[in-house]
Amino acid sequence: RSDPTQIEVKLFNRWSFDDVQLSDVSLIDYIGVVPSKHATYVPHTAGRYSVKRFRKAQCPIVERLTNSLMMHGRNNGKKLMAVRIIKHAMEIIHLLTDQNPIQVIVDAVVNSGPREDATRIGSAGVVRRQAVDISPLRRVNQAIYLLTTGAREAAFRNIKSIAECLADELINAAKGSSNSYAIKKKDEIERVAKANR
């Protein structure tokens, strides 16, 4: 990285990875900002992240968001479409906030991962809920899932494109505003867990 002859690789040739800060200490190992081996211009590294147990923690966070957009049968496997959505969403985020969109995405993921959840403990036919802490990797997974689900539901039967909805969702989640689907869900999950401690 320090070698001046090397070209600095930016995401979509616009957004720099270098000035991205992580506000949450516990998630530092689980939110990869730059791909581990070498930086890429697009959020597509074609890595086999499901081979080992925690391998997917090394997957760049923007790529995990991209992969999570390819949900609901009709979008399966359409990564080009997902990459295009992410690209548009990042441009919209930059226009609205004047921040590095990668930073906004990281903040959104940190803010929308629930910290505790209620699990079902059943013994002899009596099922009760018990509050449990959530591991850092599961927090990241939940956050990504909630963010993309919120964007997808907002864009469905709506004039706004999914890129605009995703941008709104990420900006609101990064601010911690309750207009965001992910933040609302996170609060709900934590509220249920608190009631079942």
UniProtKB/Swiss-Prot annotation:
Entry GO terms, CC: small ribosomal subunit
CDD domains: uS7_Eukaryote (cd14867)
Residues of the signal peptide: none
Keyword Phosphoprotein tagged: no
This protein's record includes keyword Ribonucleoprotein: yes
Key words, A-Z: Ribonucleoprotein, Ribosomal protein
Family (UniProt): Belongs to the universal ribosomal protein uS7 family.
Protein name: Small ribosomal subunit protein uS7
